[in-house]
Regions:
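Glycine-rich phosphate-binding loop plus the immediately following alpha-helix
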Residues: 90, 114-171
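Short glycine-rich, Thr/Ser-proximal phosphate-binding strand/loop in the N-terminal lobe
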Residues: 1-38, 42, 117
Length: 272
């Protein structure tokens, strides 16, 4: 059984032999359909699989809407992205109830318990925001250039923090908490500091939005998945939240949605 998450920029693929998951793979392509078929063929080749070995293909993600026929004539099913994300995130944790925060081109939040799955909403912040703002300000939209550049920067030179406004911490707010993203930035700010500010702003506000969206659920455990979670710099920012909330980035976090497409309940799978 093969799960494929066709994203806006990257296609991710996993396979299960029984309960055993084979190593996942990610493929980039300009065309989402080309990315799907390229990922599928390459995955079969690298894992010594034959087409007839494929019991079913389970596709999800924004690009799945472009797939209108069975993949290489194998049984093919579409799975709602929210369902796939919630299912995959839940599979990667040992918690009984969690909030799954998906951090991709944009971001959304799913509440998952043993008996319920609910989409809580989302925000228009993610990798697309980082690339778009950086294209305008830093003249590069390549996230593999932006994120390492941010490592060299100092976000304290860009963001205004509580400590810049108050001598003592406020109730529930430490002095290093952000008061205003880019509140210190000016025309002389260095590119590496700006990059740090952009990355920090996006990651921080996705996490904050996810926490606010889940406020009435009573759930305090958060699972972060999606493409942004694989970057070391993003993981460093997320570490700051661990003192306040139980935030986990599981192994294979960027493949959770592809995993969920395979293991989602049969009732959530629509055959093409």
């Amino acid at each position: 059984r093969i799960g494929i998450d066709i994203g806006s920029s990257t296609t991710k693929i996993v396979a299960f032999e029984g309960e055993h998951m084979l190593p996942p793979m990610a493929v980039k392509a300009d065309s989402q359909v080309a990315s799907l078929y390229g990922a599928f063929g390459r995955y079969l080749y690298e894992n010594n699989l034959q087409l007839l070995d494929v019991e079913g293909v389970y596709i999800t993600g924004v690009g799945s809407k472009y797939v209108e026929k069975a993949v290489y004539d194998r049984p093919t099913y579409k799975v709602d992205e929210f369902v796939a994300t919630g299912t995959g995130g839940y599979y990667l944790t040992d918690k009984k109830e969690v909030i799954v925060i998906s951090m991709g081109t944009g971001s959304f939040f799913v509440k998952v318990t043993e008996n319920e799955m609910k989409h809580l909403g989302g925000v228009g912040l993610g990798g697309g925001t980082i690339c778009g703002l950086s294209s305008i300000i830093l003249n590069t939209g390549d996230i593999h250039e932006i994120v390492p550049l941010s490592r060299k920067g100092d976000v304290a030179k860009i963001d205004l923090r509580i400590g810049d406004l108050a001598k003592e911490k406020l109730p529930g707010l430490n002095l290093d908490v952000t008061a205003s993203n880019f509140g210190k930035a000016d025309a002389q700010s260095k590119p590496e500091d700006i990059a740090a500010g952009i990355v920090h702003m996006v990651i921080e506000n996705i996490c904050q939005a996810g926490i606010l969206a889940s406020r009435n659920t009573g759930i305090k455990d958060y699972i972060l998945i999606g493409g942004l979670t694989k970057f070391f710099e993003c993981r460093q920012i997320i570490e700051d939240f661990k003192s306040l909330w139980d935030v986990t980035i599981p192994e294979y976090s960027d493949y959770a949605t592809a995993i969920g497409a395979v293991i989602a309940p049969d009732a959530e799978k629509e055959e093409i």
